[in-house]
């Protein structure tokens, strides 16, 4: 699109919103700027401009990128300003699943405009900004708690605690570069597939170092990102929400020049177990990749769901079901690789064969079972003495934890040499490139929110 002039559609004359169709690193996108007078306070016309911008992106099938700094609805306009925000929110919802929507917080963003962040596919926050629905004054009135703006809704908090921020950056220039890179992995809209690029990293490059990263013992810790870096192009990972729910890694990458979404248990954080935040993180990422036609590659090394009264009381059942729901309805190419342990319900929801993946691979070190050998023996043979339990554990491992047994039973397609992981994944993605699934028409699914 180089050489095509920008098209300014709405200026900020008398308001806080401007938008245009612009070139962003070779991609035509609808760019919205929410700022301007009165610290970006939204008046009724601003809400209408936001709605028109979202509608333009949807109708023209172009990604929607919003830069926001807003103090909320203009109080002197009365309830009409809130009505305008509602109109905008409805149009942003209509963009969901149609075009990629990326928000960048460039300054303080509060009240209704902050809620728009929750409607975005990806959120970038400049490090010295903050965002919240109810401000520090309201918190003090209702709870008596004294908080700073940063303490209540700073970029660091949203990156590590709430999960609202997928990325934080130093400034607007870094945000522009990051957004351009994110868009390079994505199509313009849901009816396109992501465009690949030439790859100088050979797809048949051996990866013997990958197996060396994973400890021989089932309980040894390691950073799964080191394994991912071994198998993707040039070792490059772009990891949204890297600081939130660190027990599950999600990342954009490419294999053989083909953009993919990666999901992986992280053994160095709570043994790679799934808790509420990890389930939310994984489900949202899987759903995002599915709607924008990014193939999914899942790397499994988990001992199950994280146990505890607090999680059960907060709804672990509902949130764990989100992972199952997201994978089960995904129609993009799906390849799963078990690196080491894969136990219990978490084994099933991490895109197992029974969630409907296309190709199921395993390393020779894989252990696929209801639980680990030691725990199983303690339940099945409670009366056994210590010496007997050692033999029983060994027998259980040989009989049930062997990946070749899983392959014989159809739970695994192939047990692969770790040194061939990159080439095996590249070959699988090539075979699945033409995959298309028809989905029965229905109004919409009822996601377990």
Locations of the language-model features?
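Ligand-binding clefts of soluble mixed alpha/beta catalytic domains
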Residues: 1-449
